[in-house]
Amino acid sequence: MKTETPSVKIVAIAADEAGQRIDNFLRTQLKGVPKSMIYRILRKGEVRVNKKRIKPEYKLESGDEVRIPPVRVAEREEEAVSPHLQKVAALADVILYEDDHILVLNKPSGTAVHGGSGLSFGVIEGLRALRPEARFLELVHRLDRDTSGVLLVAKKRSALRSLHEQLREKGMQKDYLALVRGQWQSHVKTVQAPLLKNILQSGERIVRVSQEGKPSETRFKVEERYAFATLVRCSPVTGRTHQIRVHTQYAGHPIAFDDRYGDREFDQQLTEAGTGLKRLFLHAAALKFTHPGTGDVMRIEAPMDKQLKRCLEVLRSKA
């Protein structure tokens, strides 16, 4: 069965949308439409800018008028998000802050930030389903699927540019909380170890410390000690894939329930202690940045979920 958009749509390009390629713009306008179809309608000249045919690499300018034709899409593509409607609804409950420029949410553990790698649903797809009227919603940064906590989304292209610049210039501070094995030594305040990313034959990404890798630095502070574990605050100076997880492992203190870099005996200890923990104990607790619209310095905190809180309560009772 096919569905069809009702009519031709004319979109006027705002100043903060200028500079992006027409193919990327169409992907935000025609949600759920395959890239192959977008390139097909461009190639056929069905998409016009200022009544003229354009190439996929054309960069939009402020004031351009884009003609978007009705697009037929297989119903299954239109409804790709439908099995995840409960997750979409749940996203509305974890929004921490929102204005005209940004949206900040407390990402649940187990939800990917975007679809891909066999996943049809991610936070960004969920937000677009939740806010179908939004013209622009893009991730500013990423969190691993099993990591929970503060996730920043831009609602304007100008906001995305500003926040990406802050990331590049190290003007954004991220604080994570991690439960690690054993007693973290207080004098270990920084781990500097270059990280190299490898792709296994299975397609799985694995990161290891290697002199051939990229320079990487994480700062650590002990928050609380327990009988056989430590809660540490981790502040990455660089932003490498799996950085905190690999740096804690390298320091001899892997994170609880880390299926890639963890320690099964430590996980078993936590299970036997009755903590009820079944997920990676890595939580993006706070994010400090300069607001792209007002210039104000903001610090947004995300509370831990019930599972993490209960785990710490049990460990405190046994300390």
From Swiss-Prot:
Q: Which GO terms describe its molecular function?
A: 23S rRNA pseudouridine(955/2504/2580) synthase activity; RNA binding
Keywords, comma-separated and alphabetical: Isomerase, RNA-binding, rRNA processing
Q: Which SMART domains match?
A: S4
- Give the catalysed reaction(s), semicolon-separated: uridine(955/2504/2580) in 23S rRNA = pseudouridine(955/2504/2580) in 23S rRNA
- Give every S4 RNA-binding domain span: 20-83
Active-site residues annotated for this sequence: D144
Give the EC number(s) under which this enzyme is classified: 5.4.99.24
List each coiled-coil range: none
User: Which InterPro entries does its entry note?
Assistant: PsdUridine_synth_cat_dom_sf (IPR020103), PsdUridine_synth_RluA-like_CS (IPR006224), PsdUridine_synth_RluC/D (IPR006225), PsdUridine_synth_RsuA/RluA (IPR006145), RluA_PseudoU_synthase (IPR050188), S4_RNA-bd (IPR002942), S4_RNA-bd_sf (IPR036986)
Which GO annotations describe the biological process of this protein?
enzyme-directed rRNA pseudouridine synthesis
Q: Which domain of life is it from?
A: Bacteria
Q: What does this protein do?
A: Responsible for synthesis of pseudouridine from uracil at positions 955, 2504 and 2580 in 23S ribosomal RNA.
| Family listed | Belongs to the pseudouridine synthase RluA family.
Task: Return the PANTHER family for the record.
Answer: MITOCHONDRIAL RNA PSEUDOURIDINE SYNTHASE, RIBOSOMAL LARGE SUBUNIT PSEUDOURIDINE SYNTHASE C
Protein name as it appears in the record: Ribosomal large subunit pseudouridine synthase C
Which species is listed as the source? Salmonella typhi
